A protein has these predicted regions:
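Loop-centered beta-sheet repeat module
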Residues: 128-175
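Transmembrane alpha-helix boundary signature
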Residues: 23-31, 56-64, 81-102
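Short helical (or helix-break) motifs at transmembrane helix termini and adjacent helical loops
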Residues: 109-122, 128, 227
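The feature identifies polytopic integral membrane transport proteins across all domains of life
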Residues: 32-36, 65-74, 93-108, 125-134, ...
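Entry/N-cap segments of selected transmembrane alpha helices
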Residues: 36-39, 57-88, 140, 204-227
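Hydrophobic transmembrane alpha-helices of secondary-active transporters
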Residues: 14-26, 35-68, 167-179, 187-212
Length: 227
């Protein structure tokens, strides 16, 4: 089972998609539903994923889960902003080892909710798992866009922030008004993550990964260390 491997829900479909994109890329270009879902479906799946994340935010969740969620979310956000600003100040727009400051911010401020739930359920307690109600805000690009705009490293149009916020709010209000919807989203999250990861891997191949070189390895390690 994919759950037996930490992060397997992301790693396994990603590896499969990258291998297919490298050796038989035409499988994603059949057209129709296949191309729409497995190759062009990333934006749609991300919108769905944001609704799911929003539904996980429980306004009744107080105490230790709220405390842990706020601390982890705030720490990741501040760490990403500080690292991005320092690298930008010292190395300039070109960044460190070819890694631009805004890329570092995106890698550090974001998180993987599915991986967190998997690990916290296995090794943590109920309060650790409950913290996802706040940490899920970090799964999408919302905080990343705010960080990039706040640091001045990117000019983020207000429409982009609204486009991210709307599905989050839809999920938030619907999930708090209807517990059944939240439960359905909780079940759907791994499925959405699975297909979203495939569409990401379908646009990548082994040659791209290899040409990333040292900068790609460093970025991957930084992202993994701060996940």
């Amino acid at each position: 089972k994919m759950k037996n491997l930490p992060g397997g829900l992301v790693i396994i479909p990603l590896v499969i998609a990258v291998v297919l994109a490298t050796f038989v890329p035409q499988v994603f270009q059949i057209g129709g539903y296949v191309t729409a879902l497995f190759y062009e479906g990333n934006a749609c799946m991300m919108g769905f994923f944001l609704i799911v994340c929003g539904s996980m935010i429980d306004i009744k969740q107080v105490g230790m889960p709220l405390y842990k969620g706020v601390i982890m979310t705030g720490t990741k956000f501040l760490l990403g902003v500080i690292v991005g600003l320092i690298v930008g100040k010292i190395c300039g727009p070109q960044g460190f080892l070819g890694i631009a400051p805004f890329v570092l911010i995106a890698a550090i401020t974001n998180s993987n909710g599915s991986l967190y739930i998997s690990l916290s359920s296995q090794f943590g307690n109920a309060t650790d798992t409950g913290a996802i109600s706040i940490l899920s805000l970090n799964d999408g690009p919302f905080f990343t866009l705010i960080a990039l705009g706040a640091t001045g490293l990117a000019n983020i149009p207000i429409k982009s922030l609204i486009a991210v916020l709307v599905p989050l709010l839809i999920g938030f209000f619907w999930g708090n008004l209807d517990k059944g919807f939240r439960d359905a989203c909780k079940t759907a999250q791994p499925i959405v993550t699975f297909f979203m990861t495939i569409s990401i891997g379908a646009k990548t191949d082994v040659k791209t990964i290899l040409t990333a070189g040292a900068s790609g390895i460093v970025l991957g390690l930084i992202s993994a260390a701060t996940a």
